[in-house]
């Protein structure tokens, strides 16, 4: 509202879990305890919140609407955490009465937006309207299919859209995957194509690659087509959106990874399931021609330099997925709708 953005259409699932003050403290304590083995979380309490959800100790949006239930649930959630939270015993954020009062106030402010969002989405679908589900993080951070334990606490893969939204798998018509023209990662974990030195610094500066939540500089590397093909498979992508193609302008050659070599010298054209193997692979890089042109004003595929089109075609052919949208700058209008023309066929 302060930014003059209407929130009239905002609806929040009554079943959505809340990150509570004690989750933040637990997240920080957990990372500090791991020391050099830390996962590199955002320390925003996400992991402990999911842990409470699995333990049936979570606080949900609907709980904010009943002070008595809220108090009982917060008290029950705090009980098994007393020992871990002992160093923070005097932290005012852990005062039960104050916490209940604060979150009941939130409930009063948000009550008009809390709804059965599953029913709402189903009604829109039944009426023939378009419903878009947007995932967060990425496939390689999926708790089941990603680079465990260096992952998030949920399932960002496409299949989880049904679980999170409460609609059925048959309601999903298209699945678009989004990938940068290079690879970034925040925090620890394997990164076969990681770059260091001046080139990494240049790409990071061009792409403004700093964590949205933490502000930490992102690790950066060449596009990993082995990992991207794996992501395309587990998400059954129907189209690919490639962003930040403009960041590669001025580089020649531009490299992509098409295979790994294991520590034992074996060539791997698939994403290895064993983390020990993944942590010790080296990338097989293919050099593609670069381009010098500023592509920020391009709005059709034909306006792109030949080398830039060749880069997109190489990626699409390798993945077997058509490119539907290309980002050529930070502006919302700096996109090429390849699907409107004819998607670059995979």
Predicted segments, located by residue:
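Non-transmembrane, aqueous-exposed alpha-helical and coiled segments at domain scale
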Residues: 1-346
């Amino acid at each position: 509202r302060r930014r003059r953005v209407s929130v009239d259409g905002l609806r929040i699932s009554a079943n959505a879990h809340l990150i509570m003050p004690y989750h933040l403290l637990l997240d920080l304590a957990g990372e500090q305890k791991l020391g050099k083995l830390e996962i590199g979380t955002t320390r925003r309490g996400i992991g402990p919140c999911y842990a409470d959800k699995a333990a049936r100790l979570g606080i949900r949006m609907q709980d904010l609407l009943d002070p008595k239930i809220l108090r009982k649930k917060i008290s029950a959630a705090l009980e098994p955490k007393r020992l871990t939270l002992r160093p923070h015993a005097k932290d005012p954020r852990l005062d039960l009465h104050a916490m209940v009062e604060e979150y009941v106030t939130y409930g009063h402010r948000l009550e008009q937006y809390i709804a059965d969002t599953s029913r709402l989405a189903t009604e829109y679908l039944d009426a023939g309207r378009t419903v878009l589900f947007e995932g967060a993080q990425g496939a390689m951070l999926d708790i089941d299919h990603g680079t465990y334990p260096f992952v998030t606490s949920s399932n960002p893969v496409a299949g989880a859209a049904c679980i999170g939204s409460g609609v059925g798998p048959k309601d999903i018509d298209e699945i678009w995957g989004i990938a940068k023209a290079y690879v970034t990662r925040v925090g620890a974990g394997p990164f076969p194509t990681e770059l260091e030195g001046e080139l990494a610094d240049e790409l990071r500066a061009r792409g403004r690659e700093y964590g949205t939540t933490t502000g930490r500089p992102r690790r950066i590397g060449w596009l990993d087509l082995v990992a991207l093909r794996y992501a395309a498979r587990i998400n059954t992508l129907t189209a690919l959106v490639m962003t930040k193609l403009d960041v590669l302008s001025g580089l020649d050659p531009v490299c992509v990874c098409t295979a790994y070599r294991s520590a034992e010298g074996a060539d791997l054209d698939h994403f290895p399931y064993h983390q020990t193997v993944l942590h010790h692979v080296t990338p097989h890089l293919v050099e593609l021609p670069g381009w010098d042109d500023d592509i920020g004003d391009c709005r059709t595929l034909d306006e792109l330099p030949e080398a830039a089109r060749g880069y997109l075609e190489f990626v699409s052919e390798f993945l077997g997925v058509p490119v539907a949208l290309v980002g050529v700058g930070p502006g919302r209008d700096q996109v090429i709708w390849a699907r409107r023309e004819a998607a670059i066929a995979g």
